[in-house]
Amino acid sequence: MSCKKWCSSSQAKWILAGSVTVTLVLAISLILGLTLHQGTQPGCENDAICGPDADMLDYLMGMGQISHRDGLLVTWYHAANSKKEMAAALNSDVMVLEADVTVEGFNTANETKVPIMAHPPAIYSDNTLQEWLEAVLASSQKGIKLDFKSLKAVGPSLDLLRQLTEAGRIRRPVWINADILRGPNVPISIEINATQFLTLVQEKYPKATISPGFTTLYVPQLPNSTYTQAMVETMQELVGALPQKVTFPVRAVMTRAAWPHFSWLLSQSERYSLTLWQGASDPVSVEDLLFIRDNSAAHQIYYDLFEPVLSQFKQLALNTTRKRTYYTGGSLIPLLQQPKGDGLEVEWLVLEVNGSGRRAAITVPDREGMILLDIGLQEPEAGNPVPILHTPGGPALTLESCLLRLAVHPRRWGIHVNIVEPEALRPSLATLAHLSTLGHLPWPVWVGSTVSHGSFVVPGHIAGRELLTAVAEVFPHVTVAPGWPEEMLDSGYQEQMVTDMLELCQGLRQPVSFQLQAGPLSQSPANTVARLLASSPRATVTVYHSTAGNSHVDLWAGLWAARAVDRTRVYYRISQEYWKDLQADVSSNRPSSRIGPSSVEGFPGESR
């Protein structure tokens, strides 16, 4: 009996011990499995998109996190500094982690060289950069953006990043950020030394995206205070020659007011993008964000914004049917031409005008493109001269009335104001400035004319300097479109004529589209178009045709000569018949041997 009890008791103990053992094994296996799972996240295998210097959008697309290259699709986690915040960030579905780096005990007797994760005024943290990187690399595939708050932290941090990269552990984009220039409303110098910061990056960790910013302070009492032209130009001088991708962090609440400067900056290199960020109390306007998006390519702008602004903006931005507003001084991309698309996508259009004065009616084109307006001057019996559409012997319609009528139409156009009477230049610019102020000029605008300058001085044409001076003084937010007098083109565009035009336009802030006649271009030095395009990243060439004195063979030769140099930055101001024929030849991938289109109609801006 006692043996039976002992055996029963012993059996129960073994069963209990076995159960506990099995439970422990299962628990350990589960923990180990989770740990191994975290440490063996599906990695990035394509070297082209997996390095620390990879494009963020290409990486996120490759990892299946976004569907296409659009900065609006990228999500961010702010200040993932402490271990608690870091854990929350890692457990979230955000795509990029943003964290701040300084050195332990910064500017105190206890200062060390250890990089820690903290945002000023904090100078201590429960998380070092090494611990932060170990956790992020082991348990996620999120992109990394490190914001450096002291120069002392940069060198040791870059050394650590280099070691991890050389060990093959950093297989994702890394952005290196620091505020290196004084920006709006900041009275004292608190920025990180630009030269030292950029030098450290080049020496220690050049394979990264650089994110150089401005110190800023938003002051509600100064809502119009923003980035200046000088600030933006200084930034370009600092980073223009660097080999890395560069994304400029700019304060969203101040960006639209400075858009002429940032539009210029983005055009300086395909390596550039902007990252719009929002201060916690900044009253960012959704309308301003939409304007910025409408005037840039989707891959050029990232949006690091708070709710509810982000959701409100995203809902409207992704609505393909909403009406867009374009910057008058902006590119035809993406309005009429896809990024890196063919300039032949853009068609030049004309208006039909019936009647005159207030009774005049216009028939707008049934398709999108650049609307060419030849502008002369009407001298009223009293008052100021009025710019009008120039239709010799035809009806009169004022430039203002024409543009107001176009503004109500939903189609997307650009406007090419071609000044055919020199006296109409400043009144036309004044009209454009007035309508722009009222919000009635929602498209890119070109202002151009035949100019007289240097080796191509011809009486009766606008002086080249006067064109540029008038634009700068009256309405600078346009693309300038100068051309050469036809009287000087019997031998084509000679080298000195091109040199003088380039000298005239040197240093212009505005985009320039040089107007070249196709016939004379065929008789010009082979490098004519290339020289003009090389003058500026914003320079384009527009080839147009004249029915006077040029054979159709020369005309087609000129069109193809320009096209052979560049497809993206060459436009074609030609009649619809020529435009269709050129498209057909391009589609068949062969230069044309045409002697002319099947029917040739007059086209405004042509010589006859």
UniProtKB/Swiss-Prot annotation:
Coiled-coil stretches: none
Cellular component, GO annotation: membrane
Compositionally biased spans, kind Polar residues: 586-596
Span list, region Disordered: 586-608
Membrane topology recorded in Swiss-Prot or TrEMBL: Single-pass membrane protein
This protein's UniProt keywords: Membrane, Transmembrane, Transmembrane helix
Keyword hit for Protein biosynthesis: no
Membrane-crossing segments per the record: 14-34
Cellular compartments annotated: Membrane
InterPro entries named among the record's database cross-references: Memorin
UniProt record similarity statement: Belongs to the menorin family.
Name used for this protein in its record: Protein FAM151A
Species of provenance: Mus musculus (Mouse)
Organism lineage: Eukaryota, Metazoa, Chordata, Craniata, Vertebrata
Gene: Fam151a
